[in-house]
């Protein structure tokens, strides 16, 4: 089922015109060197950065959504955001609960998401007292809550700009599990990141960007090829098969 359509979308000189489409249940990864345009693309998909062309979410152009309607359809995690110091975690999360959601269902969702992200003991803590990794997980919990299927049946899309930043190995695994669960509910996720092996293992589709252009897009195995990646990143990559999985390495000098 079609979820998102991009028709000749561009953002000034920061993102060249391209077209694409996203169906339901997919995890799509945006990869490319720093400055490639990944954050620009995500912000435009979120409706927060004006773009030329047309972005259609759930059959309706982003330009025709009211703010409160768009907030029910998608959630967006920016790459950086300062913590609001005079606020405990539980109050911050409450700002993201969908309008009209059942209070008990919201409490259950908060408990579930925070347990998965290992945040339960942080709920009463002030945001200013969180470490960088804790704050990142709180931000993730908030955007998950905004579009969590049990309390927001209208939700369609989660947009995450470098969500794994600041997370340790166990926390990354926990985030992976939540993303898989979210996609299995018929929603889709678009993620930017720099861990090529993580993308190789987790993504259903990959969009490869460089210098403000979407150069290649398609199924993961089609895009994550050593020759394609080497040309874009200007690094000599190799792909190895080990234990029934593929792994990307750089070639030794």
From Swiss-Prot:
Gene Ontology cellular component annotations, sorted alphabetically: ATP-binding cassette (ABC) transporter complex
Residues engaged in binding ATP: 32-39
Main location: membrane
Major enzyme class: translocase
Pfam families linked to this entry: ABC_tran
Subcellular location: Cell inner membrane
UniProt cross-references to SMART domains, sorted A to Z: AAA (SM00382)
GO terms, molecular function: ABC-type vitamin B12 transporter activity; ATP binding; ATP hydrolysis activity; ATPase-coupled transmembrane transporter activity
Subunit structure: The complex is composed of two ATP-binding proteins (BtuD), two transmembrane proteins (BtuC) and a solute-binding protein (BtuF).
Family: Belongs to the ABC transporter superfamily. Vitamin B12 importer (TC 3.A.1.13.1) family.
Name listed for the protein in its UniProt record: Vitamin B12 import ATP-binding protein BtuD
Gene name per UniProt: btuD
């Amino acid at each position: 089922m079609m979820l998102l359509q991009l028709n000749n979308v561009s953002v000034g000189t920061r993102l060249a015109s391209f077209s694409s489409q996203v169906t339901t249940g997919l995890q799509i990864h945006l990869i490319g060197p720093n400055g490639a345009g990944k954050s620009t693309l995500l912000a435009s998909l979120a409706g927060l950065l004006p773009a030329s062309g047309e972005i259609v979410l759930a059959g309706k152009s982003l330009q025709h959504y009211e703010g409160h309607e768009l907030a029910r359809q998608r959630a967006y995690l920016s790459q950086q955001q300062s913590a609001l110091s005079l606020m405990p975690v539980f109050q911050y999360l409450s700002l993201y609960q969908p309008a009209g959601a059942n209070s008990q269902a919201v409490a259950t969702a908060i408990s579930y998401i925070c347990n998965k992200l290992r945040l339960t003991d942080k709920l009463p803590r002030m945001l200013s007292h969180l470490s960088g990794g804790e704050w990142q997980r709180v931000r993730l919990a908030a955007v998950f809550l905004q579009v969590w299927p049990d309390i927001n049946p209208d939700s369609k899309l989660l947009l995450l700009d470098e969500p794994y930043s600041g997370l340790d190995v166990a926390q990354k695994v926990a985030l992976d599990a939540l993303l898989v669960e979210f996609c299995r509910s018929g929603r889709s996720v678009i993620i930017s990141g720099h861990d090529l092996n993580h993308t190789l293992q987790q993504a259903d589709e990959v969009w490869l960007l460089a210098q403000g252009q979407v150069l290649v897009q398609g199924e993961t195995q089609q895009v994550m090829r050593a020759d394609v990646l080497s040309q874009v990143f200007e690094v000599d990559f190799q792909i190895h098969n080990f234990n029934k999985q593929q792994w990307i390495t750089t070639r030794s000098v």
